């Protein structure tokens, strides 16, 4: 065969392989959604998070190997399969979804994780977190002039826009509520503030808000991602709500911080929608 013709056949074969199948992650490769985790939390020494894994076959094997980042010396991390029973090894939109759970412990003031290395189906796989995971240890508060009574600790990302989430507080002493916000990724939307069950306005209208000893305060709001941020309604988001207040006879502000875990997948419909979104 003419060398030029043979070389042309090689180029055509390589082009066909590239365009038809060799680079088709949706049919051939395992997908781990490292770009769909947003985690910035102030919490305890023990913490955890989830990633979603999509495979074209059931019974995916996963083993945690290591992680990289900042201040990770002494960090321990274990892998658990957190997949719900109703989607475990169930074919959805032609693929299978595994919810990867990671249980961590640190003695450091903060940890930042940039990547996680896993053994998936006997293949070493490095999962890059497009947004580094940041976990900061919560400092004990010496003031309880205002305390939390209710907050949504576990929610679903795809319910952000159609759910009014309640955040309740009780004032033991006279205080000024300075601000209410989320520490990262998201913002409150369509808020209503109630004092002793009476609506008094939105966050923008009434904060800073003076409250008296014995008052019950509730903030109802929807949640939305910050403008111009790249996210999906199937993103795992872990963050804190933060109420900043100033109690009488105190020289500094105090902050009430509560954990919020927003999961991407809560049922088979969510799992199928996530798989379709990544196709």
Language model features with spans:
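Surface-exposed beta-loop interaction hotspot
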Residues: 119-199
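Short, solvent-exposed loop/turn segments enriched in Ser/Thr/Gly
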Residues: 44-49, 107-115, 161-164, 236-239
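Aromatic sugar-binding surface patches on proteins
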Residues: 88-102, 213-224
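Bacterial signal peptide processing site
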Residues: 23-25
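Bacterial N-terminal signal peptides that target proteins for export
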Residues: 2-8
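C-terminal motif of bacterial Sec signal peptides marking the signal peptidase cleavage site
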Residues: 18-21
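Extracytoplasmic/luminal low-complexity segments enriched in Pro/Gly and acidic/polar residues
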Residues: 195-279
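Surface-exposed binding patches on compact interaction domains or structured appendages
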Residues: 47, 51, 57-96
